Swiss-Prot record:
Belongs to the universal ribosomal protein uL2 family. HAMAP family: Ribosomal_uL2_B. Part of the 50S ribosomal subunit. Forms a bridge to the 30S subunit in the 70S ribosome. SMART domains: Ribosomal_L2, Ribosomal_L2_C. One of its GO terms (cellular component) is large ribosomal subunit. Coiled coil: none annotated. Residues 223-275 are annotated as: Disordered. NCBIfam families: rplB_bact (TIGR01171). It holds the Pfam family Ribosomal_L2_C. This is Large ribosomal subunit protein uL2. One of the primary rRNA binding proteins. Required for association of the 30S and 50S subunits to form the 70S ribosome, for tRNA binding and peptide bond formation. It has been suggested to have peptidyltransferase activity; this is somewhat controversial. Makes several contacts with the 16S rRNA in the 70S ribosome.
């Protein structure tokens, strides 16, 4: 994996930085693990826009990723590493000894030909999945379950990881990348190591068209709109905001508290670090 700075042959490509992974599979994905993916374009069931700046983009198939890793004791060989347009991490195609194939999130350092296994007797090696009660304290983990058997929900994006801090009774404490310390049941499963494609955050998109390929539409300033569309809209010629900065629905957008006074999650031991 390497960062490639693109030559400034045009204004759009000036400053563009790509993440190149030469070890990724260049052919088609495994057809049996593909599903249809429809786009909502930010609309709800009434057709109203609920998320702005979404629409268009390249057509994609959803890759069915195994987040449960419940084929215990059956070794699996890594056939290839693949790009997945639906997530920031890369995925790996596993071929189990019984012939079944599954996709998993590719951990850092995983190579084609490696053998992975899951279960309580799996060795502590990157890519293997075990219950948290069988993982040594201090181990770096990713793809962590929040409910036993539900499948991994935490630390799944590129470069993500967590650290197993302690075990107390039926719960363990895990420190996430955000600094949050969270309680997780010891029967929940986690995968050893950290997620690969860790240089993903260093890329530079470079041009607006590349964001349109990803289904992201432009963000229009409120002062450039009409009064019917935004509180900052209207006026003759170029005008300022004429009031405190607000959202299109009138909510102050600079430091205004919007969090509801809801019950605190008792699984959070220590809150994440504030920026």
């Amino acid at each position: 994996m390497a960062l490639v700075k693109v030559k400034p042959t045009s204004a759009g490509r000036r400053g563009m930085v790509k993440v190149v992974s030469p070890n990724l599979h260049k052919g088609a994905p495994h057809a049996a693990l593909l599903e249809k993916k429809t786009r909502g374009s930010g609309r709800n069931n009434n057709g109203h826009i609920t998320i702005r700046h979404r629409g268009g983009g390249h057509k994609q198939h959803y890759r069915v990723v195994d987040f449960r890793r419940n084929k215990d004791g059956i070794p699996a060989k890594v056939e290839r590493l693949e790009y997945d347009p639906n997530r920031t991490a890369h995925i790996a195609l596993l071929c189990y000894a019984d012939g079944e194939r599954r996709y998993i999130i590719a951990p850092r350092g995983l190579e084609v030909g490696a053998t992975l296994v899951s279960g309580i007797e799996a060795p502590i090696r990157a890519g293997n999945t075990l219950p948290i009660r069988n993982i040594p304290v201090g181990t770096t983990i990713h793809c962590i379950e929040m409910i036993p058997g539900k499948g991994a929900q935490m630390a799944r994006s590129a470069g993500a990881s967590a650290v197993l801090l302690a075990r107390e009774g039926t719960y363990a404490q895990v420190r996430l990348r955000s600094g949050e310390v969270r309680r997780v049941h010891i029967e929940c499963r986690a995968t050893i190591g950290e997620v690969g494609n860790e240089e993903h955050s260093l890329r530079q998109i470079g041009k607006a068209g590349a964001m349109r390929w990803r289904g992201v539409r432009p963000t229009v300033r409120g002062v450039a709109m009409n009064p019917v569309d935004h509180p900052h809209g209207g006026g003759e010629g170029r005008t300022g905001e004429a009031r405190e900065p607000v959202s299109p629905w009138g909510t102050p957008s600079k430091g205004f508290k919007t969090r509801r006074n809801k019950r605190t999650n008792n699984m959070i031991v220590q809150r994440r670090k504030r920026k």
